[in-house]
Amino acid sequence: ASNFTQFVLVNDGGTGNVTVAPSNFANGVAEWISSNSRSQAYKVTCSVRQSSAQNRKYTIKVEVPKVATQTVGGVELPVAAWRSYLNLELTIPIFATNSDCELIVKAMQGLLKDGNPIPSAIAANSGIY
């Protein structure tokens, strides 16, 4: 079964959800993009590489746009006022078992879980204090 499927990137209680769908898979890089116009789209990429004889490296990138419009010649055009970029690198030894990898995923989910220090600091536009 393929895992290159669409998924909810931003879960905002249903109405404001952002879903990203597969858009490209070239040179070992999977790309998902939201249905917004290209200039306003949310984008996710993921690649897996053999980083050494002993390790696999996952490189995950997420682009979050600040959606805006710009008037050009009396026409409102969709633009991104700015973008936020997330880059995550994960290195896993090749001898890790599936249960080891499941534990790593649980640690990633805990790291970014609502209410925990790092997402709270980011959501409040502040630091760790």
UniProtKB/Swiss-Prot annotation:
UniProt GO molecular function: RNA binding; structural molecule activity
S-S bridge residues: none
Database matches in Gene3D superfamilies: MS2 Viral Coat Protein (3.30.380.10)
Keyword Electron transport assigned: no
Keyword line: Capsid protein, RNA-binding, T=3 icosahedral capsid protein, Translation regulation, Virion
Entry coiled-coil feature ranges: none
Annotated compartments: Virion
One Pfam family per UniProt: Levi_coat
A Gene Ontology biological process term: regulation of translation
Ranges where the record places region Viral RNA-binding: 31-104
Chief place of localization: virion
GO annotation, cellular component aspect: T=3 icosahedral viral capsid
Known function: Capsid protein self-assembles to form an icosahedral capsid with a T=3 symmetry, about 26 nm in diameter, and consisting of 89 capsid proteins dimers (178 capsid proteins). Involved in viral genome encapsidation through the interaction between a capsid protein dimer and the multiple packaging signals present in the RNA genome. The capsid also contains 1 copy of the A2 maturation protein.
Family note: Belongs to the Leviviricetes capsid protein family.
Subunit structure comment from the entry: Homodimer. The capsid proteins form dimers that assemble by group of 5. Twelve such pentamers are linked together with free dimers. The homodimers binds to the viral RNA via an operator hairpin, but also to many other RNA sequences in the viral genome; this interaction probably shifts the virus from the replicative to the assembly phase and ensures specific encapsidation of the viral genome.
Protein name according to UniProt: Capsid protein
